[in-house]
Regions:
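A cross-kingdom feature that marks ATP-driven nucleic-acid transaction machinery
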Residues: 1-142
Length: 142
């Protein structure tokens, strides 16, 4: 409704461009949620560790560190899965892995050999062997 009168006056093309440019700004939170839901499906389908009992995002006490997905295992609720989802079309997996490893230092504890999962909208480059990758095609099973 906000731009309706401008569209009716013939400015539809420029209004569409304006709205399209703002979509990326709004997609971060829904994308991260879709990423977490996909990881939960992978746990329940047996594609990831079956001992994961909780999976969600994590923030440290002062909210300076956020991890998009942390999977906790066993009675001790030890973090065994760490994930980062970026809405960018192409992301560097090695860079995302380094960022996740740095963020993991803020966790009270973490498994000795956690699963690292990184996600981008279309493609990941420079993928280390120690990281699992996902794209929108995986998340939405396209």
């Amino acid at each position: 409704e906000r731009y309706r009168s401008q569209i009716e006056r013939g400015l539809g093309r420029s209004v569409a461009a304006l709205l399209e440019s703002g979509i990326d700004d709004a997609m971060g939170i829904p994308w991260e949620e879709a990423f977490r839901r996909h990881l939960i499906r992978e746990v329940t389908d047996g594609a990831l560790r079956s001992d994961i009992v909780a999976l969600g995002q994590w923030w440290n006490e002062d909210s300076s560190v956020e991890i998009d997905a942390v999977g906790l295992a066993g009675r001790s609720s030890t973090p065994v899965l760490l994930g980062e989802a970026k809405w960018g079309r192409v992301e560097n997996a090695a860079s995302l892995l380094r960022s996740l490893q740095n963020k993991a230092r803020a966790l009270p504890t973490v498994a000795d050999d956690p699963i690292y999962v990184v996600c981008a909208r279309e493609r990941l480059t420079d993928v280390p062997r120690s990281v699992q990758t996902l794209t929108a095609a995986d998340v939405f099973d396209v």
